[in-house]
């Protein structure tokens, strides 16, 4: 009798634990963040293709798209372009691009985007005309409010000297942010020295003209927009009625996938203190941006990793990054076919690499695990909505 009673208690405890786990998963806020990096967007494009393919297999649905699984998708520069591609609706109100169309997009349009050089020493390297043309063609007249999930795309206004963050959740208070997606995408990609800044205007809540003078989102968030995406998710959880049950959002209630465009370990070995002690302004100017971006991206990842680990939620955060780019693959604007092939191979090879020295799990295995969480969470929410 005692044995039976103990067995029943054990079953109840298991069921309670399982129920609690699923309830927690159902309440998770899911966030996808995509770094900037020009043509190196091919690397996260390869990762997104793998992830979406896994979700389609798990849910037995060839039409499944990433926007169906993430509450917030954020990006800067080329990451902002990817964000728009997978969240902007087509005529059927589905993302106009599947993840497996991202890499072909770069192969088709990259050589033209990074080929229209102005030939001027004093001025941007590229005129940006083809970039704007293809963005208008692909994104049409779609505006922020039409995005299929919450987005967070950064830019920087050089007239007001302030960051500009385009999100759906800001529109009620700031309707002037409901800009056309092609204006936003060009702006977030308009890296100083590469493309001209972008001017456009919208209307305020009072109908007044509101002007933007924007450059690359990396100026506002550096290349890694993960913290920006997390802050947008936090605000949404606090303000959106659909998330009323989880307004006290913390990292335990968040699934965060952050995709990089690659860094180079060689950069750290390029210069010595003795050498740089002789440098002037021009020499520092050539490398300081790369140093700043590398340091900021590292610190963002370090901060997020530490926070998630301290909350015993390290499996809720996954940073996918190649840290050993070499040669032409380090360049943001080398759109030669040979280099794009190398970048695609970098993405494929990255899937087979371990997540870290301390974690032998490969990125492929980690992404499959992450996809399972996304799939289960979506099913739980669908079941709840059907009642």
From Swiss-Prot:
Protein origin, superkingdom: Eukaryota
Signal peptide location: 1-23
Gene Ontology BP annotations: defense response; lipid catabolic process
Chain segments annotated as transmembrane: none
Coiled coil: 361-385
Glycosylation sites: 115
Motif (GXGXXG): 36-41
Tissue specificity remark: Tuber and stolon.
Active site positions, chain numbering: 77, 216
Pfam families documented for this protein: Patatin
Molecular function via GO: monoacylglycerol lipase activity; nutrient reservoir activity; phospholipase activity
PANTHER family: PATATIN GROUP D-2 (PTHR32176:SF85), XYLOSE ISOMERASE (PTHR32176)
Family designation: Belongs to the patatin family.
Name assigned to this protein: Patatin-02
């Amino acid at each position: 009798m005692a044995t039976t009673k103990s067995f029943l208690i054990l079953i109840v405890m298991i069921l309670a634990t399982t129920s609690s786990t699923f309830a927690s998963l159902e309440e998770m806020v899911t966030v996808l963040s995509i770094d900037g990096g020009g043509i190196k967007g091919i690397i996260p494009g390869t990762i997104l293709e793998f992830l979406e393919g896994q979700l389609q297999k798990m849910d037995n649905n060839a039409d499944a798209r990433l926007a169906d699984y993430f509450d917030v998708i954020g990006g800067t520069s080329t990451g902002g372009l990817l964000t728009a591609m997978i969240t902007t609706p087509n005529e059927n109100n589905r993302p106009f691009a599947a993840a497996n169309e991202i890499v072909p997009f770069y192969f088709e349009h990259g050589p033209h985007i990074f080929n229209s050089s102005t030939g001027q020493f004093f001025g941007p390297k590229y005129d940006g005309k083809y970039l704007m043309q293809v963005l208008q063609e692909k994104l049409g007249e779609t505006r922020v409010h039409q995005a299929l999930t919450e987005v967070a795309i950064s830019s920087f206004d050089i007239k007001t000297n302030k960051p500009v963050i385009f999100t759906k959740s800001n529109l009620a208070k700031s309707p002037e942010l409901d800009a056309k997606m092609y204006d936003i995408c060009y702006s977030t990609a308009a890296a100083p020295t590469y493309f001209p800044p972008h001017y456009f205007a919208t209307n305020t809540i009072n109908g007044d003209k509101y002007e933007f003078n924007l450059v690359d989102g990396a100026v506002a968030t550096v290349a890694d927009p993960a913290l920006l995406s997390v802050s947008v998710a936090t605000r949404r959880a606090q303000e959106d009625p659909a998330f009323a049950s989880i307004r006290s959002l913390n990292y335990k209630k968040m699934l965060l996938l952050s995709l990089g465009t690659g860094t180079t370990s060689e950069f750290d070995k390029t210069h010595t203190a003795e050498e740089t002690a002789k440098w002037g302004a021009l020499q520092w100017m050539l490398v300081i941006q790369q140093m700043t971006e590398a340091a900021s991206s590292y610190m963002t990842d370090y901060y997020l990793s530490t926070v998630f680990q301290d909350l015993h939620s390290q499996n809720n955060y996954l940073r996918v990054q190649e840290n050993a780019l070499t040669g032409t693959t380090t360049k943001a604007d080398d759109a030669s076919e040979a280099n794009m092939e190398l970048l695609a191979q970098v993405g494929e090879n990255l899937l087979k690499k371990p997540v870290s020295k301390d974690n032998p799990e490969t990125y492929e295995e980690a992404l499959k695990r992450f996809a399972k969480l996304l799939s289960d969470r979506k099913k739980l929410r669908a079941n709840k909505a059907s009642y």
